[in-house]
Amino acid sequence: MVKSHIGSWILVLFVAMWSDVGLCKKRPKPGGGWNTGGSRYPGQGSPGGNRYPPQGAGGWGQPHGGGWGQPHGGGWGQPHGGGWGQPHGGGGWGQGGTHNQWNKPSKPKTNMKHVAGAAAAGAVVGGLGGYMLGSAMSRPLIHFGNDYEDRYYRENMYRYPNQVYYRPVDQYSNQNNFVHDCVNITVKQHTVTTTTKGENFTETDIKIMERVVEQMCITQYQRESQAYYQRGASVILFSSPPVILLISFLIFLIVG
């Protein structure tokens, strides 16, 4: 009896949700038709007036009233009166005293491909050929089995890397493969970078560096593995049918 009531409520819930979605309609956007709000072309209702040669009171070729080629009245090609292409007056083509000018330089458009490329590059800042650069770590305290190497490490630990290069953990079958690859690329990259600065490494340096980087790579693997499994658990949790049904019911209560 209880199961039948629960099934009925679930059925009513989904019917109500689909009915509510079906009744929703798009509202028409406010505003007029095409080209409302004034013309965008010069000389048609724009605040700067007509952009073509003015036709004043005088006739064509007359000495007054703005005739074509005349010294007064703002004629076409004259130094006064705001004629076409003139340095004075209002409403001249290409002048600073009007709005909506033809030759106003357009603002540079942002290239979306460049933006997307920059975003992608920022995701692996410091990366190297498909490898990611881990966060800085404190150099581990390691005992090498003899006093000389222990003392050498304490005195020279600043010369060794405090970050490691690695690939995502899902590209490896086990921890050993991850650590092996991580140690090789990190030691190689640090050695090349340091050598170009004029500093060389001895055999003792390489031996100690490999041990130090190995411990750091193990730590990096543990961090990445934990984060990877947590992401996977979250996806499984929110994709289960009971959780989806519960979320749908809560959304229905909020919207309804």
Swiss-Prot record:
Pfam families cross-referenced by the UniProt entry: Prion (PF00377), Prion_bPrPp (PF11587), Prion_octapep (PF03991)
Lipidation (GPI-anchor amidated alanine): A233
Signal peptide: 1-24
Glycosylation-annotated residues: N184, N200
Region span, Disordered: 28-110
Binding-site list for Cu(2+) 2: H72, G73, G74
Residues the record lists as binding Cu(2+) 1: H64, G65, G66
UniProt subcellular location: Cell membrane; Golgi apparatus
Keywords attached to this entry: Amyloid, Cell membrane, Copper, Disulfide bond, Glycoprotein, Golgi apparatus, GPI-anchor, Lipoprotein, Membrane, Metal-binding, Prion, Repeat, Signal, Zinc
Stretches the record annotates as 5 X 8 AA tandem repeats of P-H-G-G-G-W-G-Q: 54-95
Membrane topology qualifier: Lipid-anchor; GPI-anchor
Disulphide bridges: C182-C217
The UniProt record lists the keyword Repeat: yes
Keyword Glycosyltransferase recorded: no
GO BP, one annotated term: protein homooligomerization
Family annotation (SMART domains): PRP
Comment text on domains: The normal, monomeric form has a mainly alpha-helical structure. The disease-associated, protease-resistant form forms amyloid fibrils containing a cross-beta spine, formed by a steric zipper of superposed beta-strands. Disease mutations may favor intermolecular contacts via short beta strands, and may thereby trigger oligomerization. Contains an N-terminal region composed of octamer repeats. At low copper concentrations, the sidechains of His residues from three or four repeats contribute to the binding of a single copper ion. Alternatively, a copper ion can be bound by interaction with the sidechain and backbone amide nitrogen of a single His residue. The observed copper binding stoichiometry suggests that two repeat regions cooperate to stabilize the binding of a single copper ion. At higher copper concentrations, each octamer can bind one copper ion by interactions with the His sidechain and Gly backbone atoms.
Subunit-structure text: Monomer and homodimer. Has a tendency to aggregate into amyloid fibrils containing a cross-beta spine, formed by a steric zipper of superposed beta-strands. Soluble oligomers may represent an intermediate stage on the path to fibril formation. Copper binding may promote oligomerization. Interacts with GRB2, APP, ERI3/PRNPIP and SYN1. Mislocalized cytosolically exposed PrP interacts with MGRN1; this interaction alters MGRN1 subcellular location and causes lysosomal enlargement. Interacts with KIAA1191.
Full protein name: Major prion protein
Species of provenance: Moschus chrysogaster (Alpine musk deer)
Gene: PRNP
